Amino acid sequence: NDVGGGLDGDGVDAGPAERVAAEITAAGGRAVACSASVATPQGGQAIIATALDHFGGIDILVHNAGNVRRASLKEMSYEDFDAVLDVHLRGAFHVVRPAFPLMCEAGYGRIVLTSSIGGLYGNRDVANYAAAKVGVIGLSNVAALEGAAEGVRCNVIVPAAVTRMAEGIDTSAYPPMGAELVAPVVGWLAHESCTVTGELFIALAGRVARAVIAESPGVYRASWTVEEVDNHLDAIRYVEAPLIFPAVPDGHNEHIRYSFELAQRSNELHGSIDQGALNG
């Protein structure tokens, strides 16, 4: 699927999708072109329906649709903010939503959603893009959690490659950054041999890595003041021994449980000290 529009998402051109479908067919595969837009619920449903009509089911879903509308945060319009979220974040939901129950019913599925280092770390002049790309990670985590018992795995690719979206950027000093350096990672995540779910994988200029969300161990106190936060800031921010709570099987509750147990241990310790003082 490729709507074939410009970088800003405007326009429709069936040519790009048809050319890729022709290349796949020429190589001995089976493919059908679709130029429906993920930016609307109807478009997302049409994309999944096309797969069902031609192949009878859906085993793999890769959402990699994108557009860019640049502006500083001071100047970005609501229209440009929504236009990017419609493709990147809502667009992911528009195809995941109709495909996910079909995969669960079949007892098998592989979903790969696309985030960006712009979502992980931010980038100037693309608040819309950054917000959408970090939102995709949350969507993937939920799909991974809800699909785990159904044989459906969902992961995120965080790629960087010189494609149509790089038009206007000076890439002359870049190392090789073709899509062929990203595609094998996506291929593995979409393959039946993929053994992970709810994870993030970076693929940039030949480097493949796992990205994680980490926390510092933190500092526990039974009560806090603004001044105490300031006094303990170095310890609060100390991340030499980070905590990682993977989304699957239960990162949400593991995160809560860690804090609860820390509070309980501290309270028990203080209770023992207080009791000892009374006995003394």
Residue positions per predicted region:
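The beta1-alpha1 cofactor-binding region of Rossmann-like NAD(H)/NADP(H)-dependent oxidoreductases
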Residues: 14-18, 35-46, 78
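Substrate-binding pocket helix/loop in short-chain dehydrogenase/reductase
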Residues: 24, 72-73, 80-85
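Active-site loop immediately N-terminal to the catalytic Tyr-X3-Lys motif
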Residues: 74, 121-128, 149
